[in-house]
Amino acid sequence: MNSYIKNHCYLCITQEKIMTLTYKYSTMDRLLSLHNILKENNVDRLRELIESDKDVINMYDSNRLLPLHIAIEHSDIEIVEMLLDNNAVINGGETIKTHPINIAMILAGGRMMLYNDNKPVKPSKRIRRLLTVNNTEKYTKIVKLLIKHGADLKMVCRSYVLDFYKGGSYCIKTGYAIGYSYFSTIPLCQILWEETKHPSLYYMRRITIKCAIRAVNIELVKHFISNNLLADTDTALEDYFLEAVKTNSPKMVKLFLDSGIDINSTICENSHTALYHAVEQENVTLVMLLLNHGADPDIGDIYSMLKYAIMSSKHGVKLFNILVKNGARIRCCNDILIEAICKRYYSIISYILSLPVNYLPISILCMCIYELRNLPITRKLLKKINDINVSCDACNMYPIHAAVSINTSRLTRLLINKGADVNVRNRYGKTPIHLACMYSKIGNIKVLIKNGANVNERDNYGITPLMICSREGKVSNMEYLLANGADVNQTDYDKNTALTYAIRNKSKECTRVLLEHGADMCFMNRFHTPITIHKTHDNPAVFLAVIYLYFSVINDSSIRNKQGFVRNMRFVNNHKETKSLKDEIENELSIMKDNVFYTGDKKISLYDVLILDKLDDLANTIKRIRRIDLKQIIIFRRFIKKHIKYMEKRNSAIESVLSIINEYTSKDHLSRWWLLSPEIHRVIVSNLSMEDLKTISGYY
């Protein structure tokens, strides 16, 4: 019996030890037990648990939270104090957000407020709102308790010094570019001011004030100002005023204005005033508020302030007019005028030109002409410039160059009437007609030629206006130049003609115009002709030139003796595309030779219609030629139709001349004209050239 009792007692003791060991080494059970105690707010059980297992108060649960976190959330001050007295980790937490002091601050109504000097941020994005509860007084007491036991305030109020930022263009007075603070309520700020009485901790006050200003927390900032809490922060009042202006909030700025701050004092390292920053931020309401409270717009960096006003994306004219109306004097008229021209603010430009400006550089006139293209403003500028035949220093460009570069001839006429030289050169040797051919339409070219511009002028590379038109593919400009004496075969310094540029540009129409006006296809530079200088693949201009080459040979057989013709034919025979075109041309010419008809004893073929020297003789047979079917003629159809049209015009001119002669001689009874038959009359008149016929008949 005694043995049984003894064994039973031993077994109970062993089980108790096993349970104790299991409890001791089962973390989950230990934390679960602690959590239940914390939820029940049972101080006695917590005291017993701490006495038996003190290590449990610094263990993380599955959510990576400490018991102190849970105690803070349940707002039991006695339990929090007990945990702290037993060396609970007060500055623990994997992230800044999970530090006990941060959790207590959030529950006490604190929200993280940000300021960022390095990057302009809208006020709505400077505040990160976090979860808060209604009853925050007890959490405020917990915050006091945590601070008393050594909680690190840097977790809830911190800034970062960015050395690279100090040399930037932003205006700051402190070296802090980024900061945040959870002290966003009056009770919490009272705690902060009590705990940061030493000057070495004033930076936390400064961070909190700046965060409150940037977050547009009107109530809190008003508390700071009314209780004179901005004084002991080791920062000038102007620095906080700068932060207030940066918020773009008139209400925030008005708090400082009502406190009696000097509105015209400099508030940044660059000696700018509050008005300057308000203009820079394009805030019309804030600008008006500052001006109504006595801000002087005529002190500090007036040029930059007016420049920012003009460059405003929305309120440029309005801001400029407000500043000028309130006394801002324009000292750098030329620079301000350039800014206004860039933004095309005509009212500002007119105002500046109405001022007594002593000197205007010619570059402003060029800029105004090119950017604005405004005739009235250009007239006003011309009144202030004595000599318009002066070039800009940078590019040696003259006002006439700017005028012809735009698609309006009004400004060109205005400058010419004021005495502009139409043949003046820029730094590249280009005259106004060069630029007109490059950028403008035919209107400016007409004005320049009418006023004596040289159509064959070369630039520094030997390029003529006709070559520019060929290169740019401007057919109408090219036709007008050719009609006014442009040399179709003039070369540049590399021995390239206008035809070379047209073929390089693959411009079929430009090539056709040049060839119709006598462009030489056999002219050679050092190695090439206009045809051989470019590859034939996918270039319709080369194919057209080959067709005209054959047409030229038909009308002038001496071309075959030129070296350029030999080079062209070698090129044609060496390429598949041009060789195929050559076969088609020769086949079509054969068909035209076989297509014949007779007029009396005279045999005429369709091939004869291609020969220019025979057109005058063939004019009498135009009715027969018109009946010929041209379906098989594809390559030379254009030439035949053109020549038929010429013969029709010649016939009409002959009929007109005969009518005039008959009418004139009918009044002279002694005239022997009527002794001749009408057929002989026609033969006599047919011997006249087309030019003579036009002169007599007035036919066009």
Curated annotation (Swiss-Prot):
Positions of ANK repeats: 29-59, 63-92, 126-155, 204-233, 236-265, 270-299, 301-332, 395-424, 428-457, 461-490, 494-523
Keywords: ANK repeat, Repeat
Lineage: Viruses, Varidnaviria, Bamfordvirae, Nucleocytoviricota, Pokkesviricetes
Keyword check for Repeat: yes
Pfam families given in the database record: Ank_2, Ank_4, PRANC
InterPro entries the UniProt entry points to: Ankyrin_rpt (IPR002110), Ankyrin_rpt-contain_sf (IPR036770), PRANC_domain (IPR018272)
Species for this entry: Fowlpox virus (strain NVSL)
Claim: Repeat is one of the keywords in the record: yes
Top-level taxon of the source organism: Viruses
Xref: SUPFAM superfamilies: Ankyrin repeat
Disulfides per UniProt: none
Name by which UniProt lists this protein: Putative ankyrin repeat protein FPV018
